[in-house]
Amino acid sequence: MRTTIDLDDDILRALKRRQREERKTLGQLASELLAQALAAEPPPNVDIRWSTADLRPRVDLDDKDAVWAILDRG
């Protein structure tokens, strides 16, 4: 079957290099590589657990002396 696809230049160069090495037509090589990619097992879904921390200020922002003390420690 004939079709037209747009490939990135670097992908096409790599395909043509491999085509010469394996002595296959570009169509044969592309079909084989696509078949392998489509037959491969997709990566498993990973269960991600998000955790959060208490984001309340650790200093009373209305207390200037406490704020300056924190800034001076920094």
Curated annotation (Swiss-Prot):
Top-level taxon: Bacteria
UniProt keyword terms in alphabetical order: Toxin-antitoxin system
Function as written in the Swiss-Prot or TrEMBL entry: Possibly the antitoxin component of a type II toxin-antitoxin (TA) system. Its cognate toxin is VapC48 (Potential).
Protein name: Putative antitoxin VapB48
UniProt source species: Mycobacterium tuberculosis (strain CDC 1551 / Oshkosh)
